[in-house]
Amino acid sequence: MKTTALITALLSLSMTAQADPLVIEDGYYGGDDHGYGDVIGNTGQFDVYRAELSQVGSILTVDIYTAFAGRADDGLFSAYTYNGMGIGYGDLFLASAWDPDGTAPYLDDDNVTGTVWEYGFSLDDRWDANGGNGTLYALTGSNDDSALLAEDFMSGAIYRNGQEIAVDLSDEAANFRSQLAGGTWTVNGDHLTFAIDLTGSDLSLANGIALHWGPSCGNDIIEGYADVPEPGSLGLLALGLIGAGVARRRR
């Protein structure tokens, strides 16, 4: 009985640990950083800290922890944005594999040299104070075919150009995107939450997901890959105890 109770407890702890969100820490700079490193400009405005990913059924939830949360409606640097509304939230790009150029912090990685993003979650209003709805698109062709870059939003200032910011919804790019499912996004204090229905896609967190996100200036970009870890040591210990118990009963 004591062994059975111990095994149950260990398995419970193991499953609880694996149910925790998968975390991508921001170790990505990307090009072009113009010599600034991880963050161009004020870290108190643009720093991106980490992404946390979890999935229940077909719904992928991505939490982006960033100093930019809650600032898209502030009209930051509006004089340097083409529409005069300031810097907004970028769309979330996803792929089944991550193929950055070079090694960390990937200073030469950009829209040409890096990962070709397979999916994009397009926000309905990237300047909204609270959040809204979004649409998941399957993307084809190159990043230049399917995405808008920071330079499509900014001009006349130093920013991280060469980074994917948004799904290109223009008529010219129509052949490079296919609408799939929907989702929502919300602004929650120190982070943004994207809840995306993966129905119709080939994505699953169980198989690993790469992501790319940043504000529309690209002043800090987070990019990386999350996959389910190997069974934890507690789980392996529990399985070992189960095996030992079975062996004893057979003697």
Segments from the language model and where they lie:
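A general, composition-driven signal for non-globular sequence regions
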Residues: 12, 28, 242-244
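Sec-dependent N-terminal signal peptides
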Residues: 4-13, 237-240
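Surface-exposed extracytoplasmic segments
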Residues: 20-227
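A short, hydrophobic C-terminal helix/tail in secreted or cell-surface proteins
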Residues: 229-248
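Sec/Tat signal peptide C-region and signal peptidase I cleavage site
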Residues: 15-19
